[in-house]
Amino acid sequence: MKKEIKFSLVYRDMWQSSGKYQPRVDQLVRIAPLIIEMGCFARVETNGGAFEQVNLLYGENPNKAVRAFTQPFKDAGIQTHMLDRGLNALRMYPVPADVRRLMYKVKHAQGVDITRIFCGLNETRNIIPSIRYALEAGMIPQATLCITHSPVHTVEYYARIADQLIEAGAPEICLKDMAGIGRPGMLGELTKTIKERHPDVLIQYHGHSGPGLSMASILEVCENGADIIDVAMEPMSWGKVHPDVISVQAMLRDKGFQVPDINMKAYMKARAMTQEFIDDFLGYFMDPTNKHMSSLLLKCGLPGGMMGSMMADLKGVHSGINMILKGKNQPELSIDDLLVMLFDEVEYVWPKLGYPPLVTPFSQYVKNVALMNVMQLVKGEERWTMIDNHTWDMILGKSGRLPGELAPEIIELAKSKGYEFVDTDPQSNYPDALDDYRKEMDENGWEYGEDDEELFELAMHDRQYRDYKSGVAKKRFQDELERVKDASMMKNGYSEEEIKKLKRAKADPIIAPSKGQVLWEVSVEGPSAAPFIGRKYQHDEVFCYCLLYTSDAADDL
């Protein structure tokens, strides 16, 4: 019998890889007991990545959600883990050091055991401080290697980085195969190399199923010493998400590994409940193409979760490109033609930009450059004329060192614009900021929260936190949800009037007792806006305001 392999359910990433939003706290506390009852998970990914920000976007408190979701697993002896972007922490741009340090204190207090720390550039200067901060806070820092496939991303390249991260105190290494394009043979060899050099270090493999290599990769890393495998479950496994725990268990058991049994009754209950969450509201924000695998992803190397946004980008420029071609008497392009052009351009620009691993946010930067290049080429203009500031920051070294060399034409372009390349510690560009946020909370009369968690949330996601506190976020989300629901019904053949009738079917009309002017809300920033059809009101909740016109008061009104 071979070694024991444990499983981690990446419940958070299942959702992030499928769509825009995460389940609400009331849904999470319902699914947690079923995940525990399945009996096959040593770990569960509960938060991090976009989880906290998404809660704010629909007007909920992420701190309550994290505490409520982690508690059942803690009680059951199951470890919880979160995703952490190193210098960028829980957002898409750099975070001051004092805010990063506070994050680990807060998340440990909220019940999170492990933080998976990654940097899209595999820049150790962005990861090592987080290892130190996590250890100080009592968390387990799992240092991460972002896996991709290129001439510079060799076994020795990754093993050398792993050596540095382990020396800095990381007791665990994650192989984060975010696009699923890591070649199985290379991943097996890398796992073996790390284990030979550091036999006591735990290795956890995280791979996406989009291009179709993930099962072979899982088998290779397990044969070479991996300890834990990230898995998903139906109805959200496969596609561009992750392999299903049932398939992984069957494959590994057949090869002689010790793997846990799965309580299939609990699995089916959890499967049905997750589908219930999709049907409730989350499905409206899920891109159906994320349920499809695609070998095309091997060519461009982009994460499968980006396909939805990439197709939306292409659809947005498709008609404009064809208008340009039509004006030149050239044949128009189908959306598939355009997709192949974009993939080819990604393949062209990626090495010239220094082979940044194609993971958030650098995958977006490379994709955006490629898309802009395609548009410029169609117009008969030159490449590289539309590079945004964030991409320039990456090129110039402000996010850390690129794995490969920049092309001479990129270096010359930077010099022609008067830009300077830097090689300083990226954190040095972002001074401490907690005192400013404390001042803002004091001025607003806001509580810092248990373990300073509210202070942390403002400092990490300031704009979204302010919108959450003001109520703007919840209203915006409700409006967005109604729009996507209406759009879904229209796709199914309902007219706008039919949708209104359906929403009003069980409603009783409210008759105003007097004539006057209706004000739906008192707004100091904009016009009075009617509530969306279907909004529910509680007893004694204000429905609207009326300015009454009477003969005695007419002059005043």
Give each language-model segment a name:
Residues 160, 212-224:
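Catalytic cores of alpha/beta
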Residues 6-9, 42-46, 78-85, 115-116, ...:
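Hydrophobic faces of well-ordered beta-strands that scaffold small-molecule active sites
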Residues 549-554:
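Conserved small/polar residues in nucleotide/adenosyl-binding loops
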Residues 2-20, 76-91, 136-149, 194:
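N-terminal small/glycine-rich loop or linker at the start of catalytic domains
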Residues 4-9, 260-544:
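A mid-to-C-terminal "edge-of-domain" accessory segment
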Residues 59-63, 121-137, 152-155, 180-194, ...:
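Active-site-adjacent beta->alpha loops and helix N-cap segments on the catalytic face
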Residues 48-130, 146-158:
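Active-site beta->alpha loop and helix N-cap motifs at the rims of alpha/beta catalytic domains
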Residues 57-82, 132-143, 188-205, 254-256:
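Alpha-helix-loop-beta-strand connector modules within alpha/beta enzyme cores
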